[in-house]
Amino acid sequence: MLKYAWQSGPKQSNRWLWHLSNQIWKRSYSSKIRNIGILAHIDAGKTTTTERMLFYAGKTRALGEVHRGNTVTDYLTQERERGITICSSAVTFSWNDHRINLLDTPGHIDFTMEVEQSLYAVDGVVVVLDGTAGVEAQTVTVWSQADKHKLPRLIFVNKMDRPDADFEKCVSDLKDKLETQPVCLQYPVKNEDGVLAINDVITLERLSWQQKDLGRSYRNVKLEPSDDLRLLQEKRNELIDQLSGLDDELADVVISTESFDNVDNALIERALRRATTQQKVVPVLLGSAYKNVGIQRLMDAVNAYLPAPEERNQIYDCFGTEVAGKVFKIVHDKQRGPLTLVRILRGEIKRGMRLISARGQAEVVSKLYEPLADEYREVSAVQSGDVVICAGLKSTVTGDLLTSSQSALKNAQKRYKQSLGNTAAKVEEDDELDESDELFAIDPQIPDAVYFCSIEPPSVSSQTAMEQALKQLQREDPSLRVSYDSVTGQTVLGGMGELHMDIIKSRILSEYKIDVDLGPLQIAYKETIEAPALTTLSVEKEIAGSKQSVSITLEVVKNQAELFSLDKSPDNLPNLNTLRPRILQVLRKGSISALERGPRVGGQVVETQIRLHNATIGRGTADSFVMATAAQCVQKLLSTSGTRLLEPIMALQIVAPSERISGIMADLSRRRALINDVLPKGERNKMILVNAPLAELSGYSSALRTISSGTASMTMQPCGFSSMNSVDESLAERRAQGLE
């Protein structure tokens, strides 16, 4: 016994030391990782910025150019043909002893869902602004998405080589339109030939890039006493003053020092990092990606100011040492099959590992790859904080949370609720979904479709292949809706816009070799009830020798909160208390399913609540029969109450020369548009802010080009739904029936 104890002591000690050193190594490894997203309005230069990062990091040997169609991150045929990003892509590269996992995201409003899913995988973002345009419509959208995920940000003001670039206007836009606190770390300067250089606020240096070697090298020279240096010193003092009001460590040094000139650069950078990761400020840098200026300093700022994985996502500590990974993208490779991009939030994923999704689907990881857009390098294991591509996952969908076992998931949910102080043992069946559902990816939020259309294969023999293609595309893109219309017998697609639907058709042809036919695009109208209604439906049938019996009383009322509730009045409560939770769930599911298709144009019924008054279910009645009866009862109620149509409204920003504004506004008035404001935009242009019905905007881009002789530009995005008058409702119904 003594001999055993003497022998086991050193072994246990060695094992403990190994575990400790392993944990220290993992923390050190994680501290050198940066998971970042690149966000921007379309055409701000986001993909060009990404391509320059890859080039200067040594990941690519040649500069990728959007106009040449040879970019790494825009690898789809449609992306290279159109010069826009359609799908998010992940690339990994090293920069100054750090590993950067970068996600290049789409800038077009039709692909907002791609951005949303990508933000679950990153710890910080770089927002690219067009220096000639400032904050634009989609900039505001992606900024609000980053706000939702509480992500620290850097700003890169691109295209500062252009004569019409205005850095001060961009900074002003950040304050006014995004209501943020920008801190400028750089200022632009141009020589006599108009070549862009950068003055660095912290180091008081001028940075000049060498174009002979494609911007690989740059000179940093201390400024000599001059007006430029005095101005830069003032900016440095302002930066120190601003940061000292936000950071105690810097404030203590400022109080004890005689001059701001004595404040060490490293101290400023540490204070700036703390303020950035705490989202108190947003550092602003500048350059020109196309002209190879400023990119290396941008990557330095990513390492210096954006957080490491260990500084984020503490909410996933509830998983302990178990695996927690968020699926943010799925792509289909012809040789490897479906490839799943996962951000590892906790634990370690190894080749051959068994994983389970929060929806209960078991999977086995056959291979692991390091991402480089559409190229892959195989690895055996990946640590927490990193991004990895998993092969072999057949049922996982975008947005899923993966962990090591069902018990690990349940324990994590329990710990999470305990951390919130939520120890309630029972939640009423008609309560809203648990607030942890989004965290654990049980109920991902998917935006409503704006357009829909039918899709037909070229022949009956291609039907199965088309359905398989749509199934794969839907796994990649959750915002693509696929349904079957039992009335017409057609497959129906729902999407976020005309471009979205066009890209889906193009991808089915190029990737699956099926020349599908899309029907005319239809507006995705919604419906809402005109008046409350109450009815009772009793149904009895004999199916396969078994008696099926349901009697149910439901009511529909105007309500924007819960979809389904119980009418707990004294008359109904005794009956409701006899209904088992499972039956209540079946009744809820059947009732809500009927709201997916309204009686007028088949639009989703919104702003409507279903109230269950009472229900009597015969012994042995199948759940499917109960569900169908509930749906039938709601359909009857909708016909009784009547519905009104709600049409989608788009928010437009139109920029045009002042002399073209009157013609544009006259055309907008004919399109039932509501002009919100007309603002000056530079010296010669004006910007019109307007809301208009989507139904009136078919072909509007071409019309705007004609009216303005090609001098106007436009962006638009969904901004809600609005009621219609009876004339427009009748016209919408005729369009839905194919009569217009």
Curated annotation (Swiss-Prot):
Annotated organelle transit peptide span: 1-29
Disulfide bonds: none
InterPro entries: EF-G-like_DII, EFG2, EFG_II, EFG_III, EFG_III/V, EFG_V, EFG_V-like, G_TR_CS
Secretion signal, residue range per the UniProt entry: none
One cellular component term from this protein's GO annotations in UniProt: mitochondrion
Recorded GO MF terms: GTP binding; GTPase activity
Amino acids binding GTP: 40-47, 104-108, 158-161
Domain tr-type G: 31-310
GO BP annotations listed: mitochondrial translation; ribosome disassembly
Localization, UniProt: Mitochondrion
Alphabetical UniProt keywords: GTP-binding, Mitochondrion, Nucleotide-binding, Protein biosynthesis, Transit peptide
Family of the protein in this entry: Belongs to the TRAFAC class translation factor GTPase superfamily. Classic translation factor GTPase family. EF-G/EF-2 subfamily.
Function statement: Mitochondrial GTPase that mediates the disassembly of ribosomes from messenger RNA at the termination of mitochondrial protein biosynthesis. Not involved in the GTP-dependent ribosomal translocation step during translation elongation.
HAMAP family in the record: mEF_G_2
Protein name, per record: Ribosome-releasing factor 2, mitochondrial
Organism lineage: Eukaryota, Metazoa, Ecdysozoa, Arthropoda, Hexapoda
